[in-house]
């Protein structure tokens, strides 16, 4: 592993300036919050920063602030703290549940929300240094290779899946991300933060090389809102989602007024299902409707040679999650 220098940031603008100055000096730099994904990338020689800018020294970016306008969540909050926070658990169960499914207790005690949202793919070709599209090459080896856990939606030319659990929940909650960079601040809707390989096969989100995700803004919980996160793994030990679903329903008695459904583990971005959402609006969620919604959700799926099993698995996840959430008091 290449050695690197550590630089402690006083605030976000200082952190941005440190990275910018390092780049101007012709050297590589990376931001680090919890650092768990960055350390893995450095050890695997995917990235080789000369300077790592430590964001943990910035005060106040690990808090949850609730107001009438919703909640603001600092990007440096640990996943453990996020999952246990009473406001998040009470009003935004889908986010608390997603945070609780990430990795292991040890990693959740260190890993941050911003880091989980911005983590790089875990495709074995990318992580093992193959000259693939993500590593600057011109081939996606998974297209004709080992693709059991790759995309069935939105793939091509790269077929990675986005690994973040919390990102799926945040898109379902219609969150917004405050980003800080050399040009100042900007706010990006969560649904627009992630980018498909067709847009840029080297990147997974809109962050520039000198930008950092500062905080997450979640709108207020609406009347009758209930939510949940359902994650399917291929083994009992910790791993990333084979398929996951974040579902947010606004219920009026037995009738669904509004719905947001987002899938994880099946696409290069959190994959929203607007056609299914329209099917559910104004309807009572019955066994029949849930089954039809699940079928509609998989229209347009394009599985690869070894991951067609994800199609029926995803249908089952959607159907079961809808029925369980609609029945919840």
Regions found by a protein language model. Give the residues of each.
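C-terminal structural segment of proteins
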Residues: 1-329
